[in-house]
Amino acid sequence: MALAPSSAGVSPSSGVAAAGAGSSRPLRKVSPARQVLTLFGDYWWRNDAPLPSAALVGAMGDLGMKEPAARATLARLVRLELLEQHRDGRRTTHGLTARGRAIIEDEAAWLESFGVAPIVWDGAWSVVTFSIPEAQRALRHTARSRLKFLGFGPLYDGVWISPSDVAALARAELLALGVPDVTTMRAQLDVAGPGGPQRAWDLAGVGERYGVFRRELVASTAELTGAAALAERTGLMIHWQAFRGVDAGLPAALLPPDWPREEIRGRFGRRFDELGPAAEERMRWHVSRVDEALAWGVLERRLSR
């Protein structure tokens, strides 16, 4: 599951590429922490029982992660208070904290809605203006990252806009970060100059990224089993999640003709579901090696509509 930049301490693009065992190509560059939370979201979400650590480490091995790195990642997520560790004799398990569960539930809501249906827009814009002293560069970076995650784009320096009704949310987020001077409004915009308000986003670049993912989905047709199915499915999910940080969810009226968001969502959902039975069987195998009774808890998640 994708992580909010300010709530997880995990950069969307950090980490090294991990080759999925048996997969036809490597998972794209992504942090190991993101891979772990994606496994929780896709296979153990809404399960109150903690997941055996050995099963997690095994699944992470399917994604190309060596055991020492996998265990170090679990320890890091515990320090970030996204996972909690339990010990019962020699057995160790990991479960989501309330904070980790909230992040996954937020991501689940996004997955259920983004690209599923056309976006209805009332023509108004959320506008955020803020001022942060140049000396506080770390705060400036965090504030901008958070606004991008919420779907805002920079119209001018210190002026960010979004067609979604998220002005109040943005104000609350920035004040919580410690931004001292924030003004928000919801209003009509009359922007002079070429491109209009849409120039706040790199729509050409986002369109190219959709094209890359379309080619990946077209190439992903093999009937995979075992580790290869789990790795392929996780890689596709992580690639789709990345669009949350680059596609602001603009309505059709603001987009170029034939914007591919809904088409790609449909392709992704179908392929994700096709890989589901084999990937879930692999995850159950990892869990059953430690505790056969817990294998029933592996989630059967489907995205197609």
Describe these PLM feature segments:
Residues P133-E223:
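Mid-protein regulatory/catalytic core that forms ligand/cofactor-binding pockets
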Residues R101-W125:
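Short, amphipathic alpha-helical interaction segments positioned at domain boundaries
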